[in-house]
A protein has these predicted regions:
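Beta-sheet-rich sandwich/jelly-roll-like modules and their strand-loop junctions
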Residues: 30-102, 148-201
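Aromatic- and Gly/Pro-enriched, solvent-exposed loop/edge beta-strand patches characteristic
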Residues: 95-170
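Sec-dependent signal peptide recognition
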Residues: 12-19
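C-terminal motif of bacterial Sec signal peptides marking the signal peptidase cleavage site
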Residues: 24-28
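N-terminal secretory signal peptides that target proteins for export/translocation
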Residues: 1-11
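Short, flexible, glycine/charge-rich loop motifs used to bind or transfer phosphoryl groups or to couple energy/partner
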Residues: 19, 77, 130
Length: 201
């Protein structure tokens, strides 16, 4: 009787240990299977220009029409990875062949050129484009070549202070260069902004 009780206790002990090992194994499997894969954050599409104008203080506007040809625009970097999906433009005059360029700031090379038909004055035109991926914190520039533009300044004059954050975009400078050539502008000015060319990000 004693031997059979010992055998029974040994069997029970074996069963308990086996049960515990199986439970631990299943628990570990569940923990692996239950690891949640976090989907990438999707930000709503934004055109950062309006926020740039407000945050820069360049809220006084005058129209320049047929005022000489320039390549001009803004230097920016995204605060997150993302894509440009559209180019926007608005001018005080019609321009069927407005050239808008996205540049790699560091190499001063062209990443994308789009011709926008500004078919009506003082009207925001949006042109969908093949997506252009932008890398977080990398510097880019968007420029247009035009002899018409809105000249935006502070109401009491003065300069703005860069960088200027507008949503997920950080603007770091305004650049310009005279002429019709598609050439990277090298003159900087913090006392005004001329435009409008922008993008949807």
């Amino acid at each position: 009787m004693k031997n059979s009780a010992t055998i029974l206790n040994t069997k029970n002990l074996f069963r308990i240990m086996l049960f515990l090992l199986l439970s631990l194994s299943i628990s570990n499997c569940r923990s692996d299977d239950d690891d949640v894969i976090t989907p990438p954050i999707v930000y709503p599409a934004e055109n950062p220009l309006a926020a740039y104008i407000t945050n820069s203080g360049f809220t006084a506007t005058s129209n320049f029409i047929n005022s000489g040809d320039y390549e001009f625009g803004l230097v920016f970097s995204p605060n997150v990875n993302g894509k440009i999906t559209a180019i926007t433009a608005q001018l005080p005059d019609i321009n069927a062949t407005l050239r808008v360029t996205i540049w790699d700031f560091d190499t001063q090379t062209v990443l994308k050129t789009e011709v926008v038909n500004v078919s009506a004055a003082n009207t925001l035109i949006t042109k969908s484009v093949a997506e252009l991926a932008l890398v977080k914190d990398k510097k880019y520039a968007i420029t247009m070549n035009s002899n018409d533009w809105y000249n935006r300044t502070k109401p009491a004059a003065g300069v703005t202070t860069y960088p200027i954050t507008a949503g997920n975009i950080k603007f770091t400078d305004y650049l310009w260069k005279s002429g019709t050539a598609q050439a990277f502008p090298t003159n900087s000015d913090a006392s005004y902004y001329a435009g409008d060319a922008s993008f949807v990000f």
